[in-house]
Amino acid sequence: MAGDDREPIGRKGRPSRPAKQKVTRRRVREEDYDDDYDDDYEDEKPMPRKGKGKGGKPPRRKRAWLWLLIKIGVVCAVLIAAYGVYLDQKIRSRIDGKVWDLPAAVYGRMVNLEPDMQISKNEMVRLLNATQYRQVSAMTRP
């Protein structure tokens, strides 16, 4: 096995492809051309370049979508703020309304009731009325 007489696996006698050369594409510059010749079209203006650069503006269609989304966002923000003001007014009217209309009462008179005390039903009703207790049809809490 002296020498280089071995073939790589998979080629089966075909020669290998030549390596691809890198294609260089460079931007055409105006300095590369000689514009010293005379022609009859001197009054024509050169066409502006349309290149995709990093510092250029985005296309018009993308800018239109961006402005549309900004406008929709502003409208949504205004609507949400208006709804928040409406809910705030509704909650404040409910808190300031019927919930807090009951007067606060201080029950400062202490009455000691004991099991062996002789007190009639009329006296107990008068005592409860004097301390501003209300009569209810059913108990809601113990």
Curated annotation (Swiss-Prot):
Pfam families: PBP1_TM. It comes from the Bacteria. Residues 1-60 are annotated as: Disordered. Residues 11-27, 48-60 have a biased composition (Basic residues). Residues 1-10 have a biased composition (Basic and acidic residues). InterPro entries: PBP1b_TM. Residues 31-43 have a biased composition (Acidic residues). This is Uncharacterized protein in pulS 3'region. It comes from Klebsiella pneumoniae.
